[in-house]
UniProtKB/Swiss-Prot annotation:
Any one GO MF annotation of this record: sulfate:chloride antiporter activity
Annotated compartments: Membrane
Ranges where the record places region Interaction with RACGAP1: 592-727
UniProt-recorded name of the protein: Testis anion transporter 1
Residue ranges of the TM segments: 24-44, 48-68, 75-95, 131-151, 161-181, 199-219, 236-256, 284-304, 361-381, 384-404, 425-445
Assigned protein family: Belongs to the SLC26A/SulP transporter (TC 2.A.53) family.
PROSITE patterns reported for this sequence: STAS
A family per Pfam: STAS
Extracellular side: 45-47, 96-130, 182-198, 257-283, 382-383, 446-727
GO biological process: cell differentiation; chloride transport; meiotic cell cycle; spermatogenesis; sulfate transmembrane transport
GO CC, any one term: sperm annulus
């Protein structure tokens, strides 16, 4: 119940004494700002919608979002960038030979019956588009498609909101300079509008510029004024006083500046009664409705997540999609345009001390009351004052541009995604930019998962701590053992990169099997497999598991000598002293490996490990393998020989402590890798494997708990541990 109706939760937890004043001031400020914004919407959206229709639709939408919405500071209403996308819809039924689309409104032509019929047709198209947009958003919310927003990182949302802020600033230049230009729609429209502004700049109104600068300076000074009410800081409601003050001055004094009076006088109707949309035009507006639904939905979700992160709470994206879908369905009956989260008013509501959706409810009531009873009083408010209020509140969203150098140093992938999202939203528009942002995020995520981070670990001298060999200069490695740490899940995307990394570090290459060898694998019998003897030492070690029958299509060979196999050492013992070695079997030859460790105060510490190689090659070599054990055993008799200090790799350890998922394809390739390395006499062991990975089909021995609990801190005593491989 609380998920479907989030308002029940905040109503029960509402702090009346602490939050009431802030919500009242924020609601009144938002309501006063929404009145002139609704009056100037027709100028920016290129659609002469009656102001009262916009007011009633905004009021109903605000009430719906208060009931179903999850963002506490969100203000729902018309947003000119979303409404500007309706220009492509208006081309279906061009009004007055394109004068409405190009921005040249001619009131005298409303007397013509054909013009009035075209005007009604355009309103019907807008209403149907809004209705279809709401239906699509409802379907997205019911199907749970809001999860897509969770895959977009913070950098993508910040870049998109920064591009939105720039589009808002560009649109307000009309009100700042008091000039009219022909807005463009589609790709590169941002730069076309800049060129049109530069051409029309000589006709700028100096009074509008002066009023704009006055408002900006007043709001800048207001940033230093704070009101504390019950230990909750509230920003002084300067927007409230600016709107009321300049509205009174505009009604008393005639100022040579642009107002909404001229635009309102051109609208033939003051109010149109609600009607059902015209469903006959649905096939013509499907693509435009999909574009509008995506832009308005993700703008609402991005803005909600941004505001929620500032106040340490979370929003439900699916619930917000359902809420905004209901808002657009209801507003379509009033022949209004598509509604979404109003960026400027949401920021004003947040900065003015709004804590819950009660502020939105107050703002909607104030807006409707003023539009019905005192709407004509705000006709004299200069548009430059409203532009100054809007720009002062959206400028903070551009601060992320100055943080690009630090973002590049922190994460180059996120910085690239930021620049790609921002540039595409500016050059190609918000609709195409949003699609490119989502695709880029998925692409970068795939690239990062493909380039999984795999570290080669070594031991810090005189400790049982293992770290990356690239991070520490004094790292030493266990002779004949390679330790790899996988820092991400293993999937079909990166498992082949893991395979390439293992082969590169071990110094081997993969050689595809011939058809005869593959055929012999299929026809090999169980008796022949049981007859094969695995080379092992004569110490007290547990028996190895039988070789798994896993098909493979390649074998691994050394790069320098393809005919030579790895040293035939799989399990061995670790002896602590020289005396212990004297009790060993006579068939074993000691092989000493010395590694120089860290120098400390002029002293050298030396770690000596003794492992044992088989002396009898006929007993310790498996059938079909080259006879190299004898030569290696004879070479080990040379004391302190340089060649003896470089043992071959006989064991690979995979640290899976950071791996939480292995898909089916990754599991198959891992099995093939283990089998191919085993045939090259290299044993692969897995440490730190989480129990959840065992559900993917890995066959385990009975004593798997020991394998699970084995940590990398015990690798220095690896030969004396009973560590079994699981493949």
């Amino acid at each position: 119940m609380l998920t479907i109706f989030p308002f029940l939760e905040w109503m029960c937890m509402y702090r009346l004494k602490d939050w009431l004043l802030g919500d009242l001031l924020a609601g009144i400020s938002v309501g006063l700002v929404q009145v002139p914004q609704g009056l100037t919407l027709s100028l920016l959206a290129r659609q002469l919608i009656p102001p009262l229709n916009i007011a009633y639709a905004a009021f109903c939408s605000s009430v719906i979002y208060v009931i179903f919405g999850s963002c506490h500071q969100m203000s729902i209403g018309s947003f000119f960038l979303v409404s500007a996308l309706l220009i492509n819809v208006l081309k279906i039924s061009p009004l007055n030979n394109g004068h409405l689309v190009m921005g040249s409104f001619l009131k005298d032509e409303f007397s013509a019956p054909s013009y009035l019929m075209g005007y009604n047709k355009s309103l019907s198209v807008v209403a149907t588009t809004t209705f279809l947009t709401g239906i699509i958003q409802l379907i997205m919310g019911v199907l749970g498609l809001g999860f897509i927003a969770t895959y977009l990182p913070e950098s993508a949302m910040s870049a998109y909101l920064a591009a939105v802020a720039l589009h808002i600033m560009l649109s307000q230049l009309t009100c700042i300079f008091g000039i009219m230009i022909s807005f463009h729609a589609g790709p590169i429209s941002f730069f076309y509008d800049i060129i049109n502004y530069c051409v029309a700049l000589p006709k700028a109104n100096s009074t509008s510029i002066l009023l704009f600068l006055t408002v900006v300076v007043a709001l800048r000074i207001n940033k230093c004024i704070r009101i504390s009410f019950n230990q909750y800081p509230i920003e002084f409601p300067m927007e409230l006083f600016l709107i009321i003050g300049f509205t009174v001055i505009g009604n008393k004094i005639t100022m040579a500046t642009e107002t909404s009076q001229t635009l309102i006088d051109m609208i033939p109707y003051s109010f149109l009664f609600p009607v059902t949309p015209d469903f006959s035009v649905l096939p013509k507006i499907i693509l435009q409705a999909i574009s509008l639904s995506l832009v308005s939905s993700f703008l609402l979700v991005f803005l909600g997540k941004k505001i929620a992160s500032l106040h340490n709470y979370s929003v439900n994206s699916n619930q917000d999609l359902i809420a905004i879908g209901l808002c657009n369905v209801v507003s379509s009956f009033f022949r209004s345009c598509v509604f979404t989260g109003a960026v400027a008013r949401t920021i004003i509501q947040d900065k003015s001390g709004g804590r819950q959706q009660f502020a939105s409810l107050v703002g909607a009531g104030v807006m409707l009351l003023l539009m019905v009873k005192m709407g004509h009083f705000f006709y004299a408010l200069p548009n430059a004052v409203l532009a100054g209020i809007i720009l002062s509140n959206v400028v903070p969203y551009l601060e992320t541009i100055s943080n690009l150098p630090s973002l590049w140093r922190q994460d180059q992938y996120d910085c690239a995604l930021w620049m790609m999202t921002f540039s595409s939203s500016i050059f190609l528009g918000l609709d195409i930019g949003l699609i490119i942002s989502v695709v880029s995020a998925f692409f970068i995520t795939s690239v990062r998962s493909h380039r999984a981070k795999i570290l080669l670990l070594g031991q810090i001298p005189n400790t049982n701590i293992y770290r990356s060999v690239n991070d520490y200069r004094e790292i030493i490695t266990i002779p004949g053992v390679k330790i790899f740490q996988c820092c991400s899940s293993i999937t079909f995307v990166n498992v082949y990169y893991l395979k390439h990394k293992l082969l590169k570090e071990v110094g081997m290459v993969r050689v595809p099997l011939k058809e005869e060898e593959i055929f012999s694998l299929f026809n090999s019998s169980d008796t022949s497999l049981q007859g094969e003897k695995i080379c092992r030492c004569f110490c007290n070690c547990d028996d190895l598991e039988p070789l798994p029958r896993i098909l493979y299509t390649e074998r691994f060979e050394n790069k320098l000598d393809p005919d030579a196999s790895s040293v035939n050492l799989i399990h061995c013992s670790h002896f602590e002293s020289v005396n212990t070695s004297q009790t060993a079997s006579e068939d074993q030859v000691p092989y000493t490996v010395s590694s120089m460790s860290q120098k400390n105060q002029g002293q050298q510490y030396e770690e000596v490990e003794k492992v044992w190689l088989p002396n009898n090659s006929s007993r310790n070599s498996s059938p079909g393998l080259p006879d190299v054990a004898e030569s290696q055993g004879r070479r080990s008799l040379i004391p302190y020989s340089d060649a003896s200090l470089l043992p071959s790799v006989h064991t690979i350890i995979l640290d899976f402590s950071m791996v939480h998922y292995v898909d089916s394809q990754g599991l198959v390739v891992l099995r093939q890798i283990c089998n191919a390395f085993r045939n090259a006499n290299i044993l692969i062991l897995i440490a730190g494997c989480h129990s959840s990975l065992f559900c993917t089909g890995i066959t385990l021995p009975d004593h798997i708990t020991k394998c699970q609990q084995l940590s990398l801190n015990s690798l220095s005593r690896l030969p004396s541990f009973h560590l079994q491989h699981i493949f």
